[in-house]
């Protein structure tokens, strides 16, 4: 990775696991890091926004909060996701749809919103 540039970084699902480790790395490089979370708030030291990435309104509100706090998002890490720990034969269509919405559709949703801000800042 290059030297720190103070870039604005948004990491969805940044309160734990891989998302938190990624947030910590960007912060160590001197970047301004914002994280979204749904159920578990991140540790102190990050600008955190509660956001259900399956909701377009929540995603838009989260981006607005980050943009007000830091400015336009320059780097997006779409990390939020979920799983239903069950066998396929036990999984209902609603369960499957919920997983797809959180893991696939949400990535589209946040990437589209990030691109809008990135193009404006260009």
Language-model features, listed with the residues they occupy:
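Conserved glycine-rich cofactor-binding loop
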Residues: 15-16
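Conserved hydrophobic beta-strands of the Rossmann-like cofactor-binding core
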Residues: 8-11, 76-77
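A short, exposed helix-loop element centered on a Lys and neighboring polar residues
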Residues: 111-112
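Substrate-binding pocket helix/loop in short-chain dehydrogenase/reductase
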Residues: 87-88, 95-100
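Conserved glycine-rich Rossmann-like NAD(P)H-binding loop of the short-chain dehydrogenase/reductase
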Residues: 29-44
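The beta1-alpha1 cofactor-binding region of Rossmann-like NAD(H)/NADP(H)-dependent oxidoreductases
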Residues: 51-62, 93
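A glycine-rich helix->loop->beta "capping" turn
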Residues: 65-76, 84
